[in-house]
């Protein structure tokens, strides 16, 4: 095997299975394994080119006759806040954010379970155990971090880690930006639009 062949990823296609987004449709995915022997630039380009990461697998939709799923990249310098986006930011001014190492905790998993049970109880992640969650957070060969969102308590003497956890975003650092891998949040406060807020906060 030549060095060029070794560095070039092998791609695979999954068998058709029910689409989790569009009823009555089938989905397929194109995927490749991310391994330490692959050049970092190659992995970076895959993620910038529309592939998503799940642990050490990069994948993208590969469905026949359907292109409804679109990977979105935001050009930060060209982005302009709409009125609705400003309202979302205003509604969450009482939150703090920290960028922390990708280390799973029981507190995170409890919020993750509440989110999955409320939003995706019939989805592919519904049966994830605490070990599965830990692997999702820790199993990465790229530069990964967590964005941790907590409610500001107003008590400067209280450790920040004691404040209520409102959301978590698992992110990868790329050469020209950030890729949000997965996020979850407190679903009991819909007026906050926390999913939208976390995207805006990263922008």
Q: Predicted segment positions?
A:
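A conserved beta-strand-loop-helix scaffold within acyl/acetyltransferase catalytic domains
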Residues: 54-65, 71-191
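Terminal substrate-recognition subdomain of acyl/acetyltransferases
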Residues: 1-103
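Histidine (H) residue identity feature
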Residues: 33-36, 120, 202
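Conserved acetyl-CoA-binding loop-helix of GNAT-fold acetyltransferases
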Residues: 191-203
